[in-house]
């Protein structure tokens, strides 16, 4: 199934070449546009199945599924449906109106949360979400990402005491596409 995901990423032309500024602030000669993939229902179902199966293989227990806005929300939603677990959405910042929440969905002390992300570079975005969830009382039992760019996210996430589970590493995408990652 991993090979099918790689094929879909390539078929949807999710790898863009040029000059890009990433969320991390880093400059890059390529961009992984996973949003093209996560708007495809077939791809979303596959991603949710892959995460569910990997979590089961690893013995990861979780009560809820969370994702930081925006890119991870469709992934978290698909996984919540696949696993029949409640969904949490972590906002980048607290709402300035209405309830003023930063987390949509109910978090209780001790909730075991599986956190998902679309792409990781340095891990900053998903670590911010993990911190917000922990402050609300959640225990992060695993962090899953569709594509890890292999630029330090794994190390940064592990340094904070979490484990990253990438479905695909960027070098695997480049190998399948027949291009150099340099």
UniProtKB/Swiss-Prot annotation:
* Domain of life where this protein originates: Archaea
Query: What CDD domains does the entry give?
Result: PRTases_typeI
Binding site residues for orotate: 121, 149
Known pathway: Pyrimidine metabolism; UMP biosynthesis via de novo pathway; UMP from orotate: step 1/2
Protein's UniProt keywords contain Cell inner membrane: no
Under InterPro entries, the record lists: OPRT, Or_phspho_trans_dom, PRibTrfase_dom, PRTase-like
Its keywords, alphabetically, are: Glycosyltransferase, Magnesium, Pyrimidine biosynthesis, Transferase
According to UniProt, the name of this protein is: Orotate phosphoribosyltransferase
Organism for this UniProt entry: Pyrococcus furiosus (strain ATCC 43587 / DSM 3638 / JCM 8422 / Vc1)
Identify the gene encoding this protein. pyrE
